[in-house]
Structure formats: structure tokens, C-alpha cells
């Protein structure tokens, strides 16, 4: 272990605080602030680009930032954060995690560069897409530091880093965009601000913390890679399925069409957020009930959560049909004409988002049942379905076709995970009855 001063100094000391005991309330509040700003930034930036740089630029940004750039984030992220923050016994050091993340980040940059080289984009679009890949990969690298903050019981530092990095990069991006109206220039400023934020709020801070081991053991990075390869495939395939309709629209329609689709797709992030708030508080209870064999209680919680999601779905679909397009048009005035024909498409996306919430409920059930291999099988099957169907639906139906295939893919995942969850539930019930008999 490295011996660090107990009382941090300099700029890092301002971020860390005076070294007094960290309260749970402080951790929760800063984590909520950071998470909210991080999630909110995507919507703010998307709206700003459409309004300040135009519909075509909005479509390019939607693809670069929320689709391909985010996909490269997932690849660099490697699905490893849940593993790192729960590794409180330090099977792996921070140096091990950082070493593997540097490799995955480097590979994500190379894939991003290769993609724009063969994409046939104009120089400007290729540069914007690649810059957003760099932006997101830096985000993934910062996540390693922020996971280490959390593992050390300093979740508030994770929240502060998220909050301050987001504010800095968004302010630089919006300031440049407002002054120049050029998305490429704004993207350069955003990447510069992201690098500065990473150095200020992650690198400088972690060097002032005690008990952070930078050394990486021999062969540890490969062992860590092997331990998390299933998580990697899960997050990469999951995001591809989630974004397949966007990829198809980017490939077969105009950039401004993708801007419209990105606008009506925006409510899915709210649905995912609400679903997380509904499901996650019950995960520990579900895990305990499953492990202790209280299957009736387990089934009851699943049923009640499904009913809550169903009720929220009815409200969301009704709201989307009556108010969805008018509200989104207020947020995106430049897209009002394109949005005017998208009421059905919006409702399909809302239904797809609800199906995704059901899918997550069954996904967590399979995780609790320790059936991760079946999760990978489901993702692989539906990924093939996405590759085969997304382009065809978009060519045939445009934005509405994209919305329909999104709903279809979410339904396929939900059914796949739901069937396996029910099957393993019945299998355990039969085993219980056999043991009792």
C-alpha cells in the first residue's frame, strides 16, 4: 500500500475535504447530483446542437454522442465497474483495474478510428464522430478512478467528479457552439475540457488518497479480463440491441431524420431511470428469498414489480399519445415539422421502453439465479435478430419502422429472459417439492 498524507492539500484537498469521516448522506447527495447532471447533459447537448447548428448537425451529434460514441464507451468500460466496486477484499489492485482499462480504452480508440476511416463520411462528420469517441473513452477511463473512489468508501468523490467534469465539458461545448455555430469546433473544445476535467477531478484527487495500490501483479490483467469477459459481451451486445434502430436510421436515412428519431427516443432514458428506481430497492430482498428458498415471496415481489411497471406503462403511453409530440416540439422547435408525423412512432418507442423495463426485471432475476450464461445466449440471439431486421424495417417504414423494430427487439429480449426466469423458477420449485417429499 502507498502511504499518503491523511490531510490532502492543494486543489485535490478542496475536492476531497478536510479528511473527516465520510457520512452516508454526503455520499448519497453528491452521487445523486453527479448522476443527474451526467444523465441530463445528453438531452441538453442534443437540444442545443439542433437549435444552434441545425437539424443535420443534430443528427450527426445524435449518432456520434449517444450511439457510436456511447457504444465505444461500453467497449472501453468492459462492464467491469460492478466487479471493481464490490472487490472490497482487493483481489485486484487499482493498478490491475487501471492497466486493463488502459488496454480496453486504447482498443476502443482504434476501433473508432477504423470505423470512421471506412465509413465514407465527409471529413467533418468523420472528425466529429471520432472526437466524440475520444470524449467517451476518456469518460470510460475516468470511470476506473471513480469506481476506486467508491470502493474506498468515498462515493461522494465519484459524484463530484461526474458533476464537475460534466459542467466543465458541457460549458465549453455550449460556449463554443454558441459563438461559432460549428459542431466540429465545439467537439474539439469538449474533448479538451474532458481531458482537463479527468486530470483535475480524478488523477490529482486519487494521488492524495491513502491505501491506493498502483502496482499491478504479474498476469493479473489477463486474469481480470477472463473474470469479466461475460460482463463485457453483455454490455456491448445489450447496447447494440438498444441502439440497432439508430444505427439503421443513420445508415439508410438523412442526418436530420436521425435528429428527429433521437428527439422521440429521448423518453427512453427517463423510462430506464424510473425502472431502476422501481426495481433496484428490491434486489437484495429478491436475492435473499431466492437463496433461502422462499419462492412464494420471490414470485410475489416479481409479480408486484411487473404490475407497477404495467401501470406506469399505461400512464406513459397515454401521456405520449396526448402530449408527447407537443412537449418534444417545445424542446426542439427546429424539428417541429419532422416531429408532427411521429405520434405513432413515439408511442411505439414508449412501449419498447416499457418492454425494456420488464426485460430488466427478468434480467436481474437471472442474475440472482446465477444464470449469466443464459443472459449471454439471449443477447446473442437478439443481436442476430437486430442485424437481420433493423435495416429492412427502416428501409420499409422510415422512422416508424425504426420505432417498430426497437419495440420488437425489446419484446424479444423480454420474452427470452422471461421464459428462462420462469423455467428456472419452476425447476427450483420441483426440486424443493422433491426434497420435501
Locate each region found by the language model:
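Interhelical loop/hinge segments that connect adjacent transmembrane helices in multipass membrane
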Residues: 2-24, 156, 160-161, 184-185, ...
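Signature of the first transmembrane helix
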Residues: 4-11, 20-78, 109, 170, ...
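Membrane-water interface segments that mark the loop-to-transmembrane alpha-helix transition
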Residues: 22-38, 70, 74-117, 127-130, ...
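Transmembrane helical elements of multi-pass membrane transporters/channels
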Residues: 27-46, 164-169, 186-201, 205, ...
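Helix-loop junctions and terminal segments of transmembrane helices
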Residues: 42, 73-92, 151, 269-293, ...
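Interfacial segments at transmembrane-helix termini and the short loops linking adjacent helices
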Residues: 53-58, 116-132, 255, 322-354
Amino acid at each position: 500500500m502507498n502511504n499518503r498524507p491523511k490531510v490532502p492539500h492543494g486543489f485535490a484537498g478542496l475536492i476531497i475535504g478536510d479528511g473527516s469521516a465520510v457520512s452516508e448522506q454526503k455520499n448519497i447527495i453528491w452521487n445523486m447530483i453527479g448522476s443527474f447532471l451526467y444523465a441530463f447533459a445528453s438531452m441538453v447537448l442534443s437540444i442545443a446542437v439542433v437549435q444552434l447548428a441545425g437539424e443535420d448537425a443534430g443528427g450527426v451529434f445524435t449518432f456520434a454522442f449517444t450511439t457510436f460514441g456511447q457504444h465505444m464507451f461500453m467497449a472501453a468500460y468492459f462492464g467491469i465497474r460492478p466487479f471493481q466496486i464490490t472487490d472490497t477484499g482487493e483481489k485486484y489492485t487499482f493498478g490491475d483495474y487501471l492497466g486493463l482499462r488502459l488496454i480496453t480504452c486504447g482498443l476502443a480508440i482504434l476501433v473508432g478510428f477504423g470505423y470512421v476511416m471506412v465509413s465514407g463520411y465527409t471529413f467533418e462528420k468523420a472528425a466529429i464522430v471520432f472526437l466524440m469517441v475520444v470524449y467517451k473513452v476518456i469518460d470510460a477511463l475516468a470511470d476506473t478512478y471513480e469506481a476506486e473512489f467508491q470502493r474506498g468508501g468515498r462515493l461522494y468523490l465519484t459524484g463530484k467528479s461526474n458533476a464537475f467534469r460534466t459542467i466543465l465539458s458541457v460549458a465549453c461545448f455550449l460556449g463554443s457552439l454558441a459563438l461559432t455555430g460549428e459542431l466540429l469546433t465545439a467537439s474539439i473544445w469538449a474533448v479538451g475540457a474532458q481531458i482537463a476535467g479527468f486530470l483535475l477531478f480524478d488523477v490529482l484527487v486519487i494521488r492524495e488518497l491513502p491505501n491506493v495500490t498502483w502496482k499491478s501483479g504479474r498476469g493479473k490483467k489477463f486474469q481480470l479480463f477472463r473474470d469479466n469477459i461475460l460482463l463485457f459481451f453483455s454490455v456491448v451486445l445489450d447496447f447494440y440491441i438498444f441502439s440497432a434502430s439508430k444505427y439503421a436510421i443513420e445508415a439508410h436515412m438523412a442526418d436530420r431524420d436521425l435528429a428527429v428519431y433521437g428527439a422521440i427516443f429521448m423518453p427512453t432514458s427517463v423510462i430506464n431511470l424510473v425502472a431502476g428506481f422501481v426495481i433496484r430497492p428490491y434486489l437484495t430482498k429478491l436475492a435473499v428469498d431466492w437463496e433461502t428458498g422462499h419462492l412464494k415471496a420471490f414470485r410475489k415481489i416479481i409479480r408486484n414489480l411487473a404490475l407497477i411497471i404495467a401501470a406506469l406503462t399505461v400512464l406513459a403511453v397515454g401521456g405520449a399519445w396526448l402530449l408527447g409530440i407537443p412537449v418534444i416540439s417545445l424542446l426542439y422547435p427546429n424539428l417541429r415539422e419532422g416531429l408532427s408525423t411521429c405520434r405513432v412512432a413515439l408511442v411505439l418507442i414508449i412501449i419498447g421502453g416499457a418492454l425494456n423495463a420488464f426485460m430488466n426485471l427478468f434480467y436481474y432475476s437471472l442474475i440472482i439465479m446465477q444464470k449469466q450464461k443464459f443472459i449471454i445466449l439471449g443477447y446473442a440471439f437478439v443481436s442476430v435478430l437486430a442485424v437481420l431486421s433493423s435495416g429492412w424495417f427502416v428501409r420499409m417504414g422510415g422512422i416508424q419502422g425504426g420505432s417498430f423494430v426497437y419495440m420488437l427487439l425489446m419484446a424479444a429480449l423480454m420474452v427470452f429472459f422471461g421464459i428462462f426466469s420462469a423455467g428456472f423458477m419452476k425447476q427450483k420449485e420441483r426440486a424443493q417439492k422433491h426434497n420435501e417429499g
